[in-house]
Amino acid sequence: MSPPPTDGIDLALQHVGVRFGGLVALDDVSLRVPPGRIVGVIGPNGAGKTTLFNVVCGFVPPTSGSLTLDGRPFRPRPHRLTRLGIARTLQGVGLFPGLSVVENVMAGATHSARAGFAAALFGLPRSDRDERRLRHEALGLLAELGVAAHAAAPPATLPYAVRKRVALARALIARPRLLLLDEPAGGLSAEDITELGELVTALPDRAGGACSIMLVEHHMDLVMSVCHEIVVLDFGRVIAAGTPEQVRDDPLVTEAYLGADVPAGATPPGPGAGS
């Protein structure tokens, strides 16, 4: 018998469709996020990226098709994701204003601390040992992401780029085998995006626990620099899939971003469009 995978979850979507009344948001979408790989999902405004992310997170049920995790049927439920080894970051950082940075990160691990920080938050009996362990782990993640100096600060006092890293640390403390990133470059400067790319590239092989990554993003340069494979959506359908080089050279991708009347050799723009 083969050993269980230790380098990430194998996520697959087969012929997924989503309809909102007469509107087709996703149409026959199939993709795979193999263990330990970074797969990007891009597309122009209205392509269906956000809907796809919401399907995987369990916020939107598919009208047709199926999902699997490690080859087993998967029906996403938002409240069950962490138990399945899945963590996510959202477009907004969503930090708790009444907690310090390190406490925000600790809150991301409450599903695994049976009598720890979560209990302390809600006035329930707790284990001091669990809380000390979580705090130590949270501080380590903040150091890994270069923001340990802000551990005691309230989130509202920090630059947006720092808060984005705190949100990433909060996802990582759950030790996910699959990490879902929803437009992590949104609102960041060019320098911040470059640094973010370096962080994301290292995540599948990090010492603290490897993971697979699905990156939904509109910033073309980031996607091209960090992803092993890219899936391109347009009007809810997959129009291209492959390596960054294959996608960059695909005429359908160029047409989707720039229109039909484009010069030969034109490439999609860096920032791209929204969801």
Which ranges hold each PLM region?
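Catalytic Walker B motif of ABC-type/P-loop ATPase nucleotide-binding domains
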Residues: 179-183
